[in-house]
Structures are given as C-alpha cells and as structure tokens.
UniProtKB/Swiss-Prot annotation:
Location (main, coarse): cytoplasm
Positions annotated as active site in the UniProt record: 149, 173, 247, 250, 273, 282 (o-(3'-phospho-dna)-tyrosine intermediate)
PROSITE patterns linked: CB, TYR_RECOMBINASE
UniProt-recorded name of the protein: Tyrosine recombinase XerD
Transmembrane segments: none
Keywords: Cell cycle, Cell division, Chromosome partition, Cytoplasm, DNA integration, DNA recombination, DNA-binding
Protein's GO biological process: cell division; chromosome segregation; DNA transposition
Domain of life: Bacteria
Tyr recombinase domain mapped to chain residues: 108-295
Gene: xerD
Family note: Belongs to the 'phage' integrase family. XerD subfamily.
GO MF term list: DNA binding; tyrosine-based site-specific recombinase activity
Boundaries of every Core-binding (CB) domain copy: 2-87
Record GO cellular component, one term: cytoplasm
Length: 305
C-alpha cells in the first residue's frame, strides 16, 4: 500500500466514524480519490506528494472529460476535503487543492491529545457522577486502552465484557478478528458502568444485546452521539472541542504507544491495520508531536531570536 493510498484510507475512515457518512457517500469518495490518484500517477505523483500545479491540472481535466457538472463538482469536493483533512492532521504543510501554503509559523499541529488531556477528559466525564458520566468514562477508557474504532466500540456485545476479561475479541474491517487488551483502568470503568447500564435500556425492554444500548431508533449509541458527548466533556475539561473525537482518542492510543517505544508492527496488530503503511502515518505524527513539545516546553525552545 502506497502512502497516498494509506492517507486516502485514513480520510475515508474519518468520514465514516466522525461524520457518519453514508455508505454510498464513502463509496463515491473512494472512487473519486482513486480517479485523482490515477491522473496524478501519470506525472509520477500520488495524493501525498502532489503539488498545486498538478492538482489544478486534474481539476481542469475533469472539466474536459465531458463529465456531468455534478460528478466533476463532487470529485473536486472530495479532493479538497481530503487535503483539508491531511492539513489538519499535520501530514502536509500546504493545501495543494487551493494553491495556498500554510505559513510555517502557523502550521497546524497533529491532532494528538496529551496524556494529561486524556486524564482531564476522564475527570470531566466522571465529574458528572451519573450514569451518563460513567458511560462516557467507560467509552474513553476502552478506546484509549485498546485503540478501538468507534464502530468497533459500539458494536461490542454485552457478553464480550460480562466476565471482566483481560482481552476483547474485536471484529474489525472486513470481518477480521483481533485481540484487544484491556488495562486495569478500563476494566474498572467497565465494572462501574455496568452497574448503571440498565438506565440506558430501551423502554419496555429488560435487556439489550449491546454493551452500549440506547433508547434511540437503532437500539444502541451512534457515533454522532458519542462525538457530541466527547465535545461536551472537552469543553468542561478546558480542551478545544475540535481536538477531541473518537478518532483522535484512537490516534492518542497509537501515538503514545509509539512514543513509549512500542514496535510499529505491534501497533499495526493492535489497530487492526491490514498494511503497515497505514500505521507508519503515526511515526510522522509522533515526530511532529515530540518536536512541538520540545519547542514549546523546553526553556531554550521557547527563546526568541
């Protein structure tokens, strides 16, 4: 898998879990990015290293192909949204789809939560001292302890955690199963939540097969609702709410492991990545994160001039 393909996969995953994009939308965007990659490959480029001139040439090519205006507009939109995502993740310093380079001084930082921010987020969730607070704390602990995708978290059956296991069996992309470890903090959070879980059961039901049931139409929590709850907790914790999402918690799991010296292949297995190229994204994110810490926290790094 090339770097461009890995970035495209990460973008589509974000669209699925954070924006709850419909399957048809994800399929269309996947084809749009594949179309762009096909054009870029003719000049020896891919999505990760394309320059503004090449992207502009691609946009002009869309207009010359005789595509319907709606299709051409959607493909431009897909590419622009992709590069906004890449810029926001800190994987590039510019947005070639808009011919505007971000100045070095204002380079966006990778969306990585510090360890103390994770603790503040958990404290804000637990401070509610309610069933909702315990549920949110449980979800945060599970994602941060095991690197679960939000779709994997919300698909967990109650039986998966009913007996206080040290590991979860997670069914990921393509139906592939993997083992996800649980630390003591996550197991304690699950125990505390299970006591309050009946408060979330649909009316008229004595139980639900899901670990995180809901009274909504689906019978279980949705990714969008989890995102809203995390944003509320971020505000309460004094953290930029745009910096917090289920996907970013998964990022934090991987980045903090890498910074702690974990092998990249181990992280690949824990995240359920089919290709190591997808996991290698985190080596860049971790490097940027550590450089920022040195620049802002080290006494010499803060000196000007």
């Amino acid at each position: 898998m090339s770097q461009g393909e890995a970035w495209a996969d990460a973008f589509l995953e974000m669209m699925a879990v954070e924006r709850a994009a419909a399957r048809n939308t994800l399929t269309a965007y996947g084809k749009d990015l594949e179309d762009a990659r096909g054009f870029l490959s003719r000049s020896g480029h891919d999505l990760h290293d394309a320059d503004a001139e090449t992207i502009e040439a691609y946009f002009q090519d869309l207009g010359a192909r005789g595509l319907s205006p709606a299709t051409a507009a959607r493909r431009r939109s897909a590419v622009r949204q992709f590069y906004r995502f890449v810029l926001g993740e800190g994987w590039r310093t510019d947005d070639p789809s808009r011919r505007v380079a971000a100045p070095k001084a204002g380079r966006p930082l990778p969306k990585v939560l510090e360890r103390d921010e994770i603790e503040r987020l958990l404290a804000a969730a637990s401070a509610k001292d309610s069933a909702q607070g315990l549920r949110l704390a449980c979800m945060i602990e599970l994602i941060y302890a095991s690197g679960l995708r939000i779709s994997e978290l919300l698909a967990l059956p109650l039986l998966a955690l009913a007996r206080d296991p040290a590991y979860l069996i997670v069914k990921g992309k393509g139906g592939k199963e993997r083992l996800a470890p649980l630390n003591d903090a996550a197991r304690a959070a699950v125990k505390a939540y299970l006591v309050e879980r009946p408060a979330f059961l649909p009316k008229g039901q004595k139980d639900s097969p899901w670990l995180f049931p809901s009274r909504g139409a689906t019978g279980r929590l949705t990714p969008r609702r989890v995102g809203q709850l995390l944003e509320d907790a971020a505000i309460a914790a004094g953290i930029d709410r745009q910096k917090v999402s289920p996907h970013v918690l998964r990022h934090a799991f991987a980045t903090h492991l890498l910074e702690g010296g974990a092998d990249l292949r181990v992280i690949q297995t824990l995240l359920g990545h089919a290709d190591i190229a997808t996991t290698q994204i985190y080596t860049h994110v971790a490097g940027e994160h550590l450089a920022h810490i040195v620049q802002t926290k080290h006494p010499l790094g803060r000196k000007k001039g």
